[in-house]
Amino acid sequence: MWFTYTFAMLLVAGYVSAYGSGAPQSACQDMIPRHPVGPQNTSAPYIITTSTKVVKAGTPMQVTISGKKPENTMRGILLQARQGDKIVGKFTLDDNDSFAQLLDCGEPGNAITHKRHPPEFDKQTVTFTWTPPADLNDNIRFRATIAYSGAVFWLGVESPVVKVVA
């Protein structure tokens, strides 16, 4: 029993170490982290909010991921804007952002993931800037995978609909 527990913990530690510096590109479509455990089947203790419910195409807006309680911090994230299942738009970050980095999921900067950081720099709230394509005229949702730890994560956390108008 002790051996099984130790082996399982080493596997989790290996995956956390492997992807501690952000989601791999192989997770872009299904947004499933390549951890050796499955997602939580409970309601996520996180919410995604936006600075507006309607945005003009090509105009930047803010998107925020927050824990519902102070103890609901984030170790890792994968965030995208989706028009149906299509990844759309582009995120921008400050060069000195200590938590997040851009990820290329088919287009440069169309997703955000976490950087490697010590646990004391986990975040309870993060805000990013996203710009819809200049020719988009449709509804989108922000979709995220949010990890509390390497072994505890939630898939499919979504924002309310945002209408993008041309």
Curated annotation (Swiss-Prot):
PROSITE patterns cross-referenced by the UniProt entry: REELIN
Keywords: Antibiotic, Antimicrobial, Disulfide bond, Glycoprotein, Immunity, Innate immunity, Secreted, Signal
UniProt domain Reelin: residue ranges: 19-166
GO cellular component terms attached to this protein's record: extracellular region; membrane
N-terminal signal peptide: 1-18
Annotated compartments: Secreted
Pfam families per UniProt: Reeler
Predominant location category: secreted
Function text: May have antimicrobial activity.
Protein name: Putative defense protein Hdd11-like
Species for this entry: Manduca sexta
